[in-house]
């Protein structure tokens, strides 16, 4: 299991990996979210609520999550009840894949 959480240093590192998005104001520090004001977060996130609880949807979710993370989205929304916990597992699989390939670090992503 991958451990860790988003940090100010990590999210700034992620933001700086996308200079065109950074310069366009895509990354922001949320002013009204307790505990998140030091994080650099993408202006859009990826939600994981809908979809069938099956292997085909799991594969599509994992690929979509990895694509989003490679494209400048570092905010992922999930909960234990989304797709019977499968969405959380798909996020974990995508994160593990990208961390293992050294494409990103866990501290760059807000889940």
Predicted regions located by residue number:
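N-terminal binding-site loop/beta-alpha segment at the start of enzyme catalytic domains
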Residues: 1-110
């Amino acid at each position: 299991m991958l451990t860790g959480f988003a940090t100010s240093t990590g999210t700034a590192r992620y933001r700086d990996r996308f200079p065109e998005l950074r310069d366009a104001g895509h990354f922001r520090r949320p002013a009204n979210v307790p505990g998140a004001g030091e994080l650099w977060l993408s202006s859009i996130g990826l939600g994981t609520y809908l979809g069938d609880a099956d292997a085909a949807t799991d594969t599509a979710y994992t690929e979509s999550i990895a694509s989003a993370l490679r494209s400048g989205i570092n905010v992922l929304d999930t909960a234990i009840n989304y797709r019977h916990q499968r969405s959380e597992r798909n996020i974990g699989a995508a994160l593990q894949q990208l961390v293992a390939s050294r494409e990103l670090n866990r501290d760059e992503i807000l889940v």
